[in-house]
Every structure is written in C-alpha cells, then in structure tokens.
Amino acid sequence: MTDLQTPRLRTADPAPSDSADSSCGPDACGSAPVRRTGSSALRTRVDIALQGIRVDAPVHREAGAGPSDDGHVMLGGLGAAIPVNPKSPYAVTNGRLLLDGADIGLDVEPVKRPRFYDLSTADGVSYEKIARLHGRNILATTVVQTCMRYDEAERCRFCAIEASLANDSTIAVKTPAQLAEVAEAAARLDGIRQMVMTTGTSKGRDRGARHLARCVRAVLQAVPGLPIQVQCEPPEDLAALQELKDAGALSIGIHIESMDDDIRRRWTPGKARVSTAKYWEAWDEAVRIFGRNQVSTYLLVGLGEDPDELVASAAELIERGIYPFVVPFRPLKGTLATEVDHVLPPAGSLLEKVSEQVAALLIAAGMLSSGQKAGCAACGACGVLKTAGA
C-alpha cells in the first residue's frame, strides 16, 4: 500500500484528555497537516473538515451515531459540522474565518441554540435527549441508541453510538409519541425543514426498520409534509423498505462505509458479515421504491482503501442511482479507532482528490445533494461534496 492508502497512525501514544474542548480525541485534529497554500474554496473546506476551528459553537454534539464531536456553523452560507479544536490554525473573529490571524474571505456564523432544547416531556425527558438540531434547520435522532454489534469484537471501530447513552446525553429508545412531540415543537419554534432518523441495529429481521416506520408515521401526523430520511442496515426482509416508504419517508440511507471487503472486516467486523451483495440487493430495491438519488450510503475516506478503487466504487453506486456520501474518517473520543488504534484523520490531499473526483461523477450524472429530499447527503455538512458542486 502507498502512504495514501494506509490509515495514518499516531507515532506515539498520546496522553488521554478529558478537556471538553478537545472534541476530536487526544490531539487528533491538530495532527493532520495544515495546508496553507492555494485559495480554492474546496481546499479550505477540506482543511477545516480535518483541522477544525477554534469557535464557540452553541449547537454541538459529542459521541453518538455517525460523525460527531463537532460544532455546527454556517460557513460561507453552507451548513458545516466542524471539529471544535482549540489547536486549530483556523479561528473566528467578528463572523469572519481567520487562518493564523489573516482573514481568508469566508463568513462564519455559529448555529444558534434552538428554543426546543429548553423543553421537556411531561415525564421529564429533555427534548434535547430525544432529538438534536443539525445545521440550521434539520432535526436528527437515533431512535434506538443501542446496537446488537456493539461488543468490542463486533463493533465498528469508528462508532460511538452507545457512548452518548453512557454519558446520559440521550435515552435508549425514543418512542413515536416522543418524536412527534419534539418534531412539532422544533418545527413551530425553530423552523426545522427536514428530519433524519437513524437507528442502532436490532436483532429482528427488519434490523429496526419497522420501529423507524412507526416513528415516521407519528411525526408526520404531528408535522404533515415534513421531509424525512430514514437510515438502517439492509433488512433481511426487504419488504420492510416498502413499509418505510409507505409510512411517509422520502429517502433512505443504507450505509456500508467501505466497499472493500478487507477494510470492512478490519473496521466493521460485525457489519462485514452482511455481504456486499446483500447491500446491493437492498440498495437496488430501495432505488426501485424511493427513486434515483433518494438512496445514499456513506463512504469514509481514510480507512486505508485504495483511493482509485474508492472512486470506482462510487461510480458504480452512482450508475445505479445511489448517492455515495463521501466524508472523512473523524477520530472520536471513546471509539476503538481513537483509543486503541490511534488512527489519524486522512491526509488533506487524499480527501480533496477523492471528493473532487466523486463530485465530478455526481455532477455528470445529474445527482446533486440539492435533488435529495431529506437526509445526510441533502444536508452535506459532514463532508465537502457540496463545496465541490455536488
């Protein structure tokens, strides 16, 4: 493997840090090389995705499912979920982004804390523990905060889904009624415009899809017309995908993270037992049900996959109507990748190259994030594809 293909490891075992503002794990954000040349918007966005920003972000998230340990800002008018890193060379002053003290021409506006966070259910559960604001106007929730694959030998090495449960920042299971109550308040008080519902994987044949369907129905009764994306593993019974559509979901994410089976076995040992062929079956059926460009999957840059093969896999996904949401691997506190493996974020040159090439493929296919009705790819804040035009 070349240097671009190998996950970047820390050369020394860093001392653990419990500082609340060291959001990227011990020194992780400060470890990737800072690229200070060039003026392209994409290059700057890549740098920020890896280096983070020194900023007070009222809307932030630690641990949980998916990319986290970040703060939410509007960066040049686009939503961005950025590592909050006190060692970053990037800082915000008077609403402008500075690199080593120099204004680089981008407006930055931290997303304001939503009003619905101040409310609680009748039985005393904070709305913030039920669903979170992502970006300026997206409501997100993990409807089941546990995963059947969370034993250490099975767990995805980048995942912290149960860490937020352990630190009491969420609850294990969100009921349809709770989600409907929170969504109604978030729409009324804070103007949310779409919702994302993901779930830890359950042992049932539906892998949690049917609970998602119940939650979608309840939310749409409370907030008619709200665009909703659902996310789950490929269900053994693919009929569950139609049930999600019938419940009112407009788009779906079925996330594989890597198309390289060796990488999958190394990074996602439990999920890797679901074959890539099973993912293709689920994706193809989901495209039939939800439509082209309404089905997406995460592809993580920085797990060690050959970059040319990653782009080729993205091209195959695009050809079959699936949006490959390319995002950088982000070291998170409490994950095996950070605490045991000491893996660093990818090199900026790798993230830029892959994102630029995948964006070109998406643009050529007419599959843009703006064409997605709801979801992570529609938001785009965790990656740089929107900055690249896709």
Predicted features along the sequence, with ranges:
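Active-site-proximal loop/turn and secondary-structure-junction residues that shape catalytic pockets
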Residues: 143-147, 201-203, 232-236, 258-260, ...
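Catalytic cores of alpha/beta
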Residues: 236-246, 301-319
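Core AdoMet radical
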Residues: 138, 160-179, 186-240, 244-245, ...
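Conserved strand-turn element in the central/C-terminal portion of the radical SAM core barrel
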Residues: 227-235, 283-308, 327-331
